[in-house]
Amino acid sequence: GVLYVEPDEETLAQMKEKQAQQEEQKRLLELLKGRENKTLDGKTIQLYANIGNSKDLAAVLQNDAGGIGLFRSEFIYLEREDFPTEEEQFQIYKTVVQTMAGKRVIIRTLDIGADKQCEYFHMDKEDNPAMGCRAIRICLTRPEIFKTQLRALFRASAFGKLAIMYPMIT
């Protein structure tokens, strides 16, 4: 965001107008909760949420999402100082799947690298990290980390509709 220190009257008026527009949009979206999602041509669609951790679940449920289209599992790794255990990951995934109560949950496997660095991974600096060793490439070069995550995901899948997304595969 942008911080305005001692904004002038014109800037203050613009920000108040923007705030009013956002509140109106929020109010209109509230009216759509609980209704079927349809395109203009009448086709029913599902709207899924994208989340980074289980703390986002309340907002997902509050906003009536049809499921989770992307759970960014890398934040489990980024929010700590050492590799998460299988049990720690399992408990997180299980909580997400159970909370969604039968709705589809798509969890992306570890997508570390490029803009998401994790100190304890001890990754080499790269000229172009976006195209370098990241995501599935890291998982395949560090199978012990990948297998731990996959075991946790497979265990959690017994508690709901869990699907797995593999990043950076074309």
What are these regions (language model features)?
Residues G1:
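Conformationally flexible catalytic loops at phosphate/diphosphate-handling active centers
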Residues R27-T170:
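Conserved alpha/beta-domain cores
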